[in-house]
Design a protein with these regions (language model features):
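N-terminal export signals
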Residues: 1-18
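Well-ordered alpha-helical scaffold segments within catalytic/enzyme domains
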Residues: 43-56, 104-117, 176-191, 270-289, ...
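Active-site-adjacent bridging/hinge elements
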Residues: 72-85, 148-157, 242-254, 424-430
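Aromatic-rich carbohydrate-recognition surfaces in CAZymes
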Residues: 95-231, 446-460
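Extended ligand-binding clefts on enzyme/binding-domain cores
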Residues: 99, 135, 139, 143-146, ...
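C-terminal capping/lid segments that line or modulate ligand- or cofactor-binding pockets
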Residues: 156-162, 167-169, 177, 333-354, ...
Length: 471
């Protein structure tokens, strides 16, 4: 499975064939055999065959073939349930489904649905399953494949039922679901996913967002954990640091699953603005729920205005920038974390143009030593976060840097670094040591693998000559 390297040949027949034999052996596909793959998509197999000849760099080509189908190869459980598709997707080396990860894991496959009906059913099944999950608990981030319980059952929170794996409140979990459903609908025009249950789930989403604006008090959600990692629990008996209600939405935890320091996490609020506008369009067009659609737009506009008023500040070096977290009282956090949504990813998720002046200032800040979680070493440079500790770079940040520029040399540099920091495994990882890429975390992390594949596809489509050259 993900992360297993293929050993080079220990005996070579002759020096004249050495380079050929080493290459032939080193870059053998690390995908499971066809009979061991969890799901096979004809369209995905076709795109892999089409793209490989367009990548000159042999190792990068090999990594694309390993990474792009990794979610389908290794993480999918697909079946029919009550005559509707039902899909459960684990993260990789953790056998639970995160709303965030599972949505992102299938995202690059969506444009291929037009050529593969089975793939479309699989993604519809994921939307159906996620809808069930949200109805169980909109505050949870990760779910079991049934009422199996979890080793986090001892967490101190209000609603830890057996279907939940982890109940950390993160805005982006709900946003990722809306993003997935909206894009599925946009590409297929299929409205079968928009059931009465889906609408009820979306009413729950909006209700949860509004509750976490904290206008009527601290709400109904708290979370604390008996642990030796401060970032795994919230302060003040699980309610988090105080916030002043200014229109922003509290997120108790970040997309890294680490506790927020100040409750208003700006990248996730940006994502909420985009998602609420998408939700409004669906509710208006598909359901004809005009009043609810207006409610979604009004909430999006309120959050957006609050981001611009309370979520930016003047940095002494970089100028006007976005804060990472604020509390509405005037306190803020100047940093970025690699996980998506991040400040770096704002254009990727549709909040702003990558040419926006405030974004460009922010980008310069977070990709520099002005960001306490920017690391640079012998192996590479990029953004990390407190989840795995100091001096560990997340490949996800390097991928996102490439997604948010039109500078071909910058993209080339990112691709080269991604190629050279796989620890010779052929896969992406959660993070790697800035001084030694062979020291990495999570050998089987499907989200990062698929995101890397998505980047390669974008480069092939947008800058085809770049991959036909030596990096």
């Amino acid at each position: 499975m993900g992360g297993l390297a293929v050993a080079a040949m220990s005996v070579r027949p002759s020096l004249s064939f050495a380079a050929f034999r080493e290459s032939e052996t080193k870059f053998v596909s690390l995908r499971p055999s066809i009979d061991k793959r969890r799901f096979v998509s004809r369209a995905v197999e076709v795109i892999i065959k089409e793209v490989k000849p367009k990548i000159k760099d042999e190792k990068l080509r090999w990594m694309f073939e390993n990474c792009f189908p990794n979610t389908l190869d290794t993480t999918v459980r697909y079946k029919m349930k009550n005559d509707r598709p039902d899909t459960f997707i684990i993260t990789g080396d953790i056998a639970a489904m995160w709303l965030r990860d599972s949505s992102a894991q299938v995202w690059p496959y969506l444009p291929l649905m037009k050529d593969d009906r089975d793939l479309q059913f699989l993604i519809a099944g994921l939307i159906n399953r996620q809808t069930e999950c949200i109805l169980i608990d909109p505050y949870a981030i990760a779910f079991n494949d049934g009422p199996l319980g979890s080793y986090w059952e001892t967490d101190h929170t209000q609603h830890m039922v057996k279907e939940l794996h982890e109940r950390k409140w993160e805005i982006e979990s709900l946003c990722y679901h809306i993003r997935l459903a909206y894009q599925y609908w946009t590409l297929t025009k299929d409205t079968s996913i928009f059931s009465a249950d889906w609408h009820e789930a979306m009413k729950l989403v909006v209700r949860t967002f509004k509750e976490q604006q904290r206008k009527q008090g601290i709400g109904t959600y708290s979370f604390s954990r008996d642990c030796d990692r401060p970032t795994d629990s919230q302060i003040n008996n699980g309610w988090g640091a105080p916030v002043k209600p200014v229109g922003l939405i509290v997120s108790s935890f970040r997309p890294s699953d680490d506790a927020t320091q100040f409750g208003f996490l700006i990248p996730s609020n940006m994502f909420a603005v985009v998602s609420l506008r998408q939700l409004s369009e669906i509710e208006h067009t598909v359901y004809n729920h005009i009043d609810f659609a207006k409610e979604c737009i009004a909430l999006a506009d309120e959050v957006d205005a609050a981001i611009r008023r309370y979520g930016t500040f003047n940095h002494p070096i970089c100028g006007r920038v976005y804060a990472f977290e604020v509390d509405g009282f005037g306190n803020g956090l100047c940093m970025d974390d690699a996980n998506i949504p991040s400040l770096l990813s704002a254009p990727y998720l549709g909040y702003c143009s990558f040419k926006d002046a405030v974004y460009q200032n922010t980008r310069k800040l977070i990709w520099s030593d002005n960001n306490p979680y920017f690391f640079k070493g012998k192996a590479g440079e990029g953004i990390g976060g407190p989840h795995v500790g100091l001096n560990y770079i997340w490949p996800m940040s390097i991928i996102m840097k490439a997604f948010t520029t039109d500078d071909e040399e910058e993209i080339r540099s990112c691709l080269k670094q991604l190629r050279d920091t796989d620890g010779e495994t052929g896969f992406m990882h959660e993070s790697f040591n800035a001084e030694n890429a062979a020291d990495f975390t999570r050998p089987w992390f499907a989200w990062a693998n698929t995101l890397f594949g998505e980047l390669i596809l974008k480069v092939v489509q947008t800058y085809p000559n770049l991959l036909l050259q030596t990096l």
